[in-house]
Every structure is written in C-alpha cells, then in structure tokens.
Amino acid sequence: MLFTGDQCYEEEEWLLETGAQVVSDILKIGHHGGNRSTSARFLDAVRPKVAVTTTPAWVATMPMPAEVTAMLQARRIPYFRSWEYGTLTICSDGKRFRIVLK
C-alpha cells in the first residue's frame, strides 16, 4: 500500500523523478482526494488495483474532483471513500488483500 498523505502534484513529480518504486496494489489517494493530487502520470506509474481516500467529516460533503474520479473510472480502478463507507479495513496475508467495509 502506498500512503501519499497530503501529497500534491509537485510531490508526485518529485517522487517519480527520483526513480522511486511506486507500484502498489493499493493507493491511498493524496490530499483526501482533493484538488491537485493524483495526476494521471502518477496513477499510471503506481498502477493500483484499488484506491482509498480518507476523508474527514468537514470535507465529506464535497465530491472528489471529477478529474480524479474520471481517471480512476477510465482505468477501472475501484475506489472507496471513508466518509461513504465508514471504517475501511484492509486485510492481507502478504500476497492477497481484501477490503472490509464497516
């Protein structure tokens, strides 16, 4: 799982330029799924099987930017927002993973 925290476009570009291995099955979308995070280039480099957004209550009423959801949908990457599903638990045996919604 790749945790991006409050990472925005500039940090994504820096990370890619360093040659860091960013491929991950699960991507925690940067900056709570807000503007200026998760560029197409970064998403293509990570190649996640699923994306997760942790969204505090004060942001919950704002939709994730259309461009982010469009990129995820175009790549057929399922995404989960904590405010929609509540607690998101990711279970793994080191080879496979599953997301438990509560």
Please state what every model-predicted region is.
Residues M1-M64:
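Active-site-proximal loop/helix segments of hydrolase catalytic cores
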Residues V50, T55-K102:
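Binuclear metal-ion centers of metallo-dependent hydrolases, dominated by the metallo-beta-lactamase
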